[in-house]
Amino acid sequence: MDALIMAGGKGTRMGGVEKPLIKLCGRCLIDYVVSPLLKSKVNNIFIATSPNTPKTKEYINSAYKDYKNIVVIDTSGKGYIEDLNECIGYFSEPFLVVSSDLINLKSKIINSIVDYFYCIKAKTPDVEALAVMIPKEKYPNPSIDFNGLVPAGINVVSPKHGYQKEEIMVIDELIFNINTKDDLKLAEMLLKKDGL
């Protein structure tokens, strides 16, 4: 399975900065996503950038230039769904979609998501997508709550437009999404507490 990192947003809630390049404990946010993907069973990593994130594109092309399995995709930057739809043509089978602003993502979590999707797909062939969720009580400050579940910022989707039959996977590990400056402060505390 391949992966797509969404890294073309405007970063509005962070004051209009390129969120993938925000430093957290000395590392760029996007590195917290690329690193575990490289250590996982994912084959190729596509990174969607846009006119909103030109420095992110430069950073990826420089920092990961020796990785032949990392490819930058230029999108319009009109919005998450629009950018995702622009990337669909790069894929011929289901793929992971990962936000560029996640911390605490680990390769074993990625592998378990991939394995779970293929297991579900083998039992129910018409399943096309997987939404990964975290129990609300594990999440420090959820901005979205679906019946006690918080989106983890990582999903599996099929390369087609429109409705996709979706299953849900609930994981116990906290994958933390950085949306605001308060989230960034909280993430720093969590990382220091965990010694990361």
Curated annotation (Swiss-Prot):
Q: Which GO terms describe its biological process?
A: cobalamin biosynthetic process
Check the record and name the InterPro entries matching this protein: AdoCbi-P_Guanylyltransferase, CHP00454, MobA-like_NTP_Trfase, Nucleotide-diphossugar_trans
Q: Name one GO molecular function term.
A: cobinamide phosphate guanylyltransferase activity
Q: Which domain of life is it from?
A: Archaea
Functional pathway: Cofactor biosynthesis; adenosylcobalamin biosynthesis
Pfam families found in the cross-reference section: NTP_transf_3
The residues forming a coiled coil are none
Annotated catalysed reactions: adenosylcob(III)inamide phosphate + GTP + H(+) = adenosylcob(III)inamide-GDP + diphosphate
Q: Its function?
A: Guanylyltransferase that catalyzes the synthesis of adenosylcobinamide-GDP (AdoCbi-GDP) from adenosylcobinamide-phosphate (AdoCbi-P) and GTP. Is involved in adenosylcobalamin biosynthesis. Binds one GTP per dimer. Cannot use other NTPs or GDP. Does not display AdoCbi kinase activity. Is also able to catalyze the condensation of 2-phospho-L-lactate (LP) with GTP in vitro to form PPi and (2S)-lactyl-2-diphospho-5'-guanosine (LPPG), but is much less efficient than CofC, the presumed enzyme catalyzing this reaction in vivo.
Q: What is this protein called?
A: Adenosylcobinamide-phosphate guanylyltransferase
Organism encoding this protein: Methanocaldococcus jannaschii (strain ATCC 43067 / DSM 2661 / JAL-1 / JCM 10045 / NBRC 100440) (Methanococcus jannaschii)
Gene for this chain: cobY
